[in-house]
Curated annotation (Swiss-Prot):
Pathway: Pyrimidine metabolism; UMP biosynthesis via de novo pathway; orotate from (S)-dihydroorotate (quinone route): step 1/1. One of its GO terms (biological process) is 'de novo' pyrimidine nucleobase biosynthetic process. The lineage of its organism: Bacteria, Pseudomonadati, Pseudomonadota, Gammaproteobacteria, Pseudomonadales. Belongs to the dihydroorotate dehydrogenase family. Type 2 subfamily. The keyword Cell membrane applies. The keyword rRNA processing does not apply. Gene3D superfamilies: Aldolase class I. This is Dihydroorotate dehydrogenase (quinone). PROSITE patterns: DHODEHASE_1 (PS00911). Keywords: Cell membrane, Flavoprotein, FMN, Membrane, Oxidoreductase, Pyrimidine biosynthesis. One of its GO terms (molecular function) is dihydroorotate dehydrogenase (quinone) activity. It holds the Pfam family DHO_dh. It comes from Azotobacter vinelandii (strain DJ / ATCC BAA-1303). It is a peripheral membrane protein. It catalyses: (S)-dihydroorotate + a quinone = orotate + a quinol.
Length: 347
C-alpha cells in the first residue's frame, strides 16, 4: 500500500508532500486508523535513560516539527517519537524551495532552517495528543538569536517543554542555522551543557521528576572532535547523545540532480559516516552514556548495524519517507535477531 502512496506523494513537490503526509497522519491518528493500515512491529522492550521503550526504533526529529501528528505516528508502531526542532518564537525558516529528493540515492537534501510555529504551539499540540509513550522534544535557537546568546533560547525551550517531554534533545548540529554547529566545540559546548545541566536540576526539583537531556551532533567532525564531545558530555552529566544529524558532505550523490543544493544531506549516503561516529562515541563513552543512532537506515539490517556499533536505540526519518511504516517492523526484527531475542506479540 505504501508503494502506491509514495508514487502519488512523489508526484508532488517534496514540501507539499511532507505537509500532506502530516495532515493525513494527524487525521488518521485522531480517528485511530493508522494502526490498521500497517503491520505493526512486535514488542522488543528496552530501558534507556531510565525510560521504558516498547521497542528501540523511533522517529527522528524533523518530520513532525510542530507536534501535529503525534498520535498518528505512534499508531504506526514507533517505539518512541521525537518532535521538533522547536524554537522559542515562531519562524518561517529559509525560502522555498528548501527540500529536495534524490531518489536514486534514497536521499534528501534540506535547508529548512528550523521552520516551526514556536514552542507554545507545539505544547498545545502535545497536550491535545492522547499518546502516553516516550516522547522526545527537540529544541533549538531562533535564527535571529546571536550564537553567543543561544543558551538563552535553549533554556527558554527547556523550561517550557520539561513538564511535557519524556526526554529533551538539544540540537546543536543543524547545518541550516548559521553558526549553530560552532556550539559543538570547546568552551562554547561546555558552557551550554553546564547551563542546561544546572537548569535540569532546578526543573527536576520543581516538577518532581528528572527529564533526561540528549545532545544531537553532526557527522562532519573529525574522530578527535567527536571524542572531545563525548568527554564533554560525560564531564557535564548529560544523559544521552544522538548521532547524527545531516551531513554537509556529498559523497555518494555526486552528479545527481539536486546534489549541489545547499543544505544537509540525509538518507543512505550518510549511513557509513553516521555509523562511524557511533563507533567513535562508543569507544570513548565505554557504555557510560547511551547512544541513539540515526542516519541512513533504509533497511532493517542497517538498524542492527548501528546497534552492533554501540547504539542503544535507533531513529529513522529519510528511510521512512522512502520505505514507509514497514521499515519500523523490519528494523525491530533485525535488532531482535542480532540480540538473539524473539519479539513478543504486537504493541
Amino acid at each position: 500500500m505504501y508503494t502506491l502512496a509514495r508514487q502519488l506523494l512523489f508526484k508532488l513537490s517534496p514540501e507539499t508532500a511532507h505537509e500532506l503526509t502530516i495532515d493525513l497522519l494527524g487525521a488518521g491518528g485522531r480517528l485511530g486508523l493508522n494502526g490498521l493500515l500497517c503491520h505493526r512491529p512486535a514488542s522488543l522492550p528496552v530501558r534507556v535513560m531510565g525510560l521504558d521503550f516498547p521497542n528501540p526504533v523511533g522517529l527522528a526529529a524533523g518530520l513532525d516539527k510542530n507536534g501535529d501528528a503525534i498520535d498518528g505516528l505512534a499508531q504506526l508502531g514507533f517505539g518512541f517519537v521525537e518532535i521538533g526542532t522547536v524554537t522559542p518564537r515562531p519562524q518561517p525558516g529559509n525560502p522555498r524551495p528548501r527540500l529536495f529528493r534524490l531518489p536514486q540515492a534514497e536521499a534528501i537534501v534540506n535547508r529548512m532552517g528550523f521552520n516551526n510555529l514556536g514552542v507554545d504551539h507545539l505544547l498545545a499540540r502535545v497536550q491535545a495528543a492522547r499518546y502516553s509513550g516516550v516522547l522526545g522534544i527537540n529544541i533549538g535557537k531562533n535564527f535571529d538569536t546571536p550564537v553567543e546568546r543561544a543558551v538563552d533560547d535553549y533554556l527558554i525551550c527547556l523550561d517550557k517543554v520539561y513538564p511535557h517531554a519524556s526526554y529533551v534533545t538539544v540540537n546543536v548540529s543543524s547545518p541550516n542555522t548559521p553558526g549553530l554547529r560552532s556550539l559543538q566545540f570547546g568552551d562554547s559546548l561546555r558552557q551550554l551543557l553546564e547551563a542546561l545541566r544546572q537548569r535540569q536540576e532546578e526543573l527536576a526539583g520543581r516538577h518532581g521528576r528528572r527529564v533526561p537531556l540528549a545532545i544531537k551532533i553532526a557527522p562532519d567532525m573529525s574522530d578527535e572532535e567527536t571524542a572531545q564531545v563525548a568527554r564533554a558530555l560525560l564531564d557535564t552529566g548529560m544523559d544521552a547523545v544522538i548521532a547524527t544529524n545531516t551531513t554537509l558532505g556529498r559523497e555518494g550523490v555526486e552528479g545527481l540532480a539536486h546534489a549541489g543544493e545547499a543544505g544537509g544531506l540525509s538518507g543512505a549516503p550518510v549511513r557509513e559516516k553516521s555509523t562511524h561516529a557511533v563507533r567513535v562515541l562508543a569507544g570513548e563513552l565505554g557504555g557510560r552514556l547511551p547512544i541513539v543512532a540515526v542516519g541512513g537506515i533504509t533497511e532493517g539490517r542497517h538498524a542492527a548495524e548501528k546497534i552492533a556499533a554501540g547504539a542503544s536505540l535507533v531513529q529513522i526519518y529519510t528511510g521512512f519517507v522512502y520505505k514507509g511504516p514497514a521499515l519500523i517492523r523490519e528494523a525491530v526484527e533485525a535488532i531482535a535477531a542480532l540480540r538473539g531475542e524473539r519479539p513478543v506479540g504486537t504493541h
